[in-house]
């Protein structure tokens, strides 16, 4: 079906509920202990050309990627009475052709009796002796199979043993030698033994033994079969080029079940003329000189073996089909084709022979056991289920039919039966088997061992071979014929199989060159399938013809495409204006190998209607309908991608009318959707589930939903442990929160259709998916974060785990000082020392040293080392994982995806002329790994401040100068530079150059100084001579301490920023703590100075650094009284918090005290300054309040926070921000904390 590779089948087999037979019990059931020899011989006999398969090596097609398994589970009613061992019973004419020297087997009726292989009788010393005749029944063989001594001593017999094939499921009589003298004489010729070397036999035996070991290991992996033998049904057209060892297993239960005959068909079809005259080919047989062909010629006399071992056979999935028919392998290609054609046509006609000759059963009595000593060859068991269904009591029989698609292997189907523990007598069971076998042998000879038997037993008309070349055509033809013969109670929309449903009986015709292997690991015989009763549920028994339906189902799934795979001609590309993007190999169907130039054609391919297959998928828990095998296998492949093998039941197949085949509606292909199409229509139109009735379904698990919102919620649902799985291909690793999202995300990396958005379930094309993920759903913004269990602080980013650990250890974990002599612990070392001095005075000073212990805040566990606590906290962090969402534009983190979408919509997707900025209500308090609080970044005024002036550019883009690539995601850029160019970048890379920094403040300072040319300058106000400037506040402080120590109390410091813009000023608030070693409040003098410069327009260069300088307006004087009278004009709103050193106003006395200590190093109480200020400005409060222009009830009017410039814009008095509306200014003013609280208290009515 394709050339894709899949995981090893053994790995898949271990994950499924496949009954098996315990190999140990099967070995114990052999009373003679000939398991190894038996397995090797049978494996070798089934190997037409063992040299084609190296010893111990797995089958090359074993890892074929296109292998998609489908398991059909049903149950069957079986007898309470255990069926006896099947033994062959020959007619008198056939027995007359047997050699009189055939060694009898006394225990041939016992199920555990080993075989006598190819007439080689075992002796005590381990060697073999050969009877005179070659046409012998199977016998025992206890010695080494292929020893040099045995091969030299026995000559021809070893060669015959190498050539013979005791077919496990062959139930026909051996080909009479008397009817073909030329063949007989050739077989008996002593010169034949010289054609095969004994060393070659030993090499082949080694290969077989390796296959035995491989096979036993696979059986041990399977699930026990509850003490029941395996009912094996197989159908396998085997190519003569790839046979391999087949390992049988001994029966472990006294009860046995039946095995249908299945001599395989050759790979070459022949005409009807060859079928009618097969004897013409015998001279060609005699003239053949190929040693392999000569060796296989000996297969003619021995056609069958004891059926008990057929029942227990289980093969490795990598082994080819064991059913290499003796007739087929012994005859040349023409004769083989004749037999194959006749077998196939006979089996095609078999469904017409529904009426069995019941009278034949009465002719068989229990005396048939007398013939078992002469031959253990079982007869055809076509109606073996009669022995089951006619029993007095019945118990459920569990059927598992597992079909595996493989390009060039054999088709097998394995049915395992859970039989009852108690068994009836072996003799009665064997007689019953013989009776049923006789009846089916005469009435339904679907597969024969020779053309002569075919001509004697076949009584039905032959169908043309050309009408049954395709499996689907065969199914439709036989189904229509079955419908004409019997009424069917099947509805087109059947959800369950009813009791009276008569499903079409389809025989599986052999198609030359088609090889399929059994996914269940069991190789079984084919040819004619035993019509076992398939039970839907206990009590609902379906007719025996259902087995033919199962055969047809397997034939359809595993049939070879009658036409070669279609490959479009993509050498000439379509015109660019068409907008078609064609892959190099086209859009390929992974199930059948066909490729198409257009994706719509692939969708039509999946939607074609050739039949109707209804199954109940056990994984999806729903009834599904498929109209072609590709759609069914596509559904099975999707389960396979999740590590599951599709298991289904309630199989119903029905043909479709010609009108439905050619008159179907056009479908929307998978993925052919434009971005404008909503997720609702996308999911509605592009569902691959052909039987789905709902418009909203998950493309991954096929769950149906009522609407789009439920589908989105389904993809957003976080499963338990969803934070434990991450995609390692993404950088940083992307958390996969549920199975559907994980499957869709992994398929994006593989670029396999359908491409589904992991966030909302929308199906998109390749070129549309990236745009949808980055702009609509923001899939790549999802990050793995950690939440502190104590304060619910959320940490996100690259080092979020280390950050939350550090936070928990420093903020919440307690440190105690433990007494070295007793269990007492104290929170301080002084307390521990006092305790030791008072309670343990005998301890020396060095022994009194307390020891620090660390207590986990979450589980109260105490550790003696801090490193142990850190390791312990990791165990708690596994439960504290959560998903956070990082804004791709400003790096803010959000705990909810909806909050991120609202933030992006309101902040980054609106026009630059937006009047205001909405409040981020959903933003929670979050910290980056370096301790910054992301939620405390103040909003920027978009109408006034450009993106280039913001701390982090709005539209971030990093470019690699070496390979000229651009990245919008910072992590991807860092990973690219590390992996491709070996450059280790820090957490905050610059967007304008290749520099990187460890903190955002350092990055802002770098952008401001290096790229904008804006330098922050600090002037010394105490230097009366030449103007002294300093690059940092710390250097200025050192200068003042060294040069102006005595003048520090009356000095003020100022900073001059000649080229500062509004954005630089606003960002400098955050940098003040880094540059000056202190944390400046938003009500700082810098903001006041900026506001004054905006209003007054006083240039900074004109302000002289001498005497007392007014910070708001830049007024400078040496007279303090004059200075105090001047600064009163800046006190608006009656506030009494004004700095007497620089004139800056504050909303509260605590802010003023902090300002005095930080800026002026003054610890005096601000009450004196407040009283002086109130005394000097009593007359100006009313006028200043009126000039403020605020409403009487507005807090801004109280503190003078609302100012209006010449352009009619409103300015915040605290920080100097511009706003176009009073409402926006009022909202912004709340961010100033204490200033807003003070204004609110002042404005509150008494």
From Swiss-Prot:
InterPro entries, sorted:
Zn532-like, Znf-C2H2_11, Znf_C2H2_sf, Znf_C2H2_type
> Which regions are flagged for Low complexity bias?
287-301
Q: Where is the composition biased (Acidic residues)?
A: 929-940
Q: Output compositional bias ranges, type Basic and acidic residues.
A: 24-47, 302-317, 341-350, 360-375
Q: Which domain of life is it from?
A: Eukaryota
Q: What is its main location?
A: nucleus
Q: Where are the zinc fingers (C2H2-type)?
A: 587-619, 696-719, 817-840, 854-876, 885-908, 958-981, 988-1011, 1018-1044, 1137-1160, 1210-1232
PROSITE patterns, per the entry: ZINC_FINGER_C2H2_1, ZINC_FINGER_C2H2_2
Q: Name one GO cellular component term.
A: nucleus
**Keywords from the named record:** DNA-binding, Metal-binding, Nucleus, Repeat, Transcription, Transcription regulation, Zinc, Zinc-finger
Which tissues is this protein detected in according to the database?
Widely expressed with highest levels in kidney, spleen and ovary.
Region: Disordered, residue numbers: 24-387, 907-953, 1045-1093
Bias-annotated ranges (Polar residues)? 88-111, 163-195, 326-338, 914-923
Q: Where in the cell is it found?
A: Nucleus
What family name appears in the similarity comment? Belongs to the krueppel C2H2-type zinc-finger protein family.
Instruction: State the function annotated in the UniProt record.
Output: May be involved in transcriptional regulation.
Q: Can you name this protein?
A: Zinc finger protein 687a
Which organism is the protein's source?
A: Danio rerio
